[in-house]
Amino acid sequence: MSEETVQRIRALAIPPAWTDVWICPYPMGHLQATGTDAAGRRQYLYHERWRARRDAEKFDRMLTFAHRLPQVRERVDSDLERRGLPREKGLAVAVRLLDLALFRVGSESYTRDHGSFGLATVRRDHVRTSGDVIRFDYRAKSGQRRVQEVRDAELAPIVRTLKRRRDDNAELLAYRGGTGWRDVRSEDVNAYVKELAGEGYSAKDFRTWHGTVFAAMALAVGGEVPGTQAARRRRISDAVKEVALELGNTPAVARASYIDPRLLDRYEEGFTIGGALADVSDGDLADPAFRDAVEAAVLRLLEDGRPELAAA
């Protein structure tokens, strides 16, 4: 084995706990290594250039998703107005929650294997309501306790109905089908999102878009962009930590997977969404008018950086 190959393998930093490791023999292969971690899950290491290209494509897709969100929300609003609790209304409840609270959609198999929950598997006893407030308290991915509150006058009574329904299923989300209740499953939610937003989109795209929106707000609330690179990078680091806390991820994962890098580039250039809004620190993303203004400002900043609208 050549010294060059040895150095490439070392640079992959394959975790020592991995077993059944395979390493690509070609330095430019898009998949550089695979292995099984200590929890028995198959893991993958990709070439940096391939990951960068895929990440760029993902965030470009997010811009299209953001442009389609108004029509998605319009359909969700319409389905929430249906009488009773038919399938469309049950799925609309799920998507409204995805849009408001940064949930992972979860899956039945992941809950079974790891004992943690996402939106599709959260149980009735994980949820409390008080007036317009819905409070979720559950064990999320990696065993983290997640406490999330949603204030929504339309959703709260529907959630109370779901909690009080008479059937043996522990999961919160359900709809009336035929003569009884049927669980809302993760594949149902993803199919509904695809129907509303288009081919290739899923429940996860709400978290990705909102991660960028939260980062844009965090950077704008910080005030005028600092004049030195070191100070700007400290502000970026603080904003990433805030987003990670909202998402329930590490800062590294939040930055790599949920924050459009162009947003951080714009900040380094001296621009935020602050100039497009009266005061982003006083708004509430649960307010549709404020949310729409913030999202429009983020889109302008990412798509063409219009400084007359975006400068801090």
Predicted regions and their residues:
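Short Lys/Arg-enriched helix C-cap and helix-to-coil transition segments
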Residues: 137-139, 267-281
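Extended hydrophobic/aromatic segments used for targeting, binding, or gating
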Residues: 159, 244, 265, 271-274
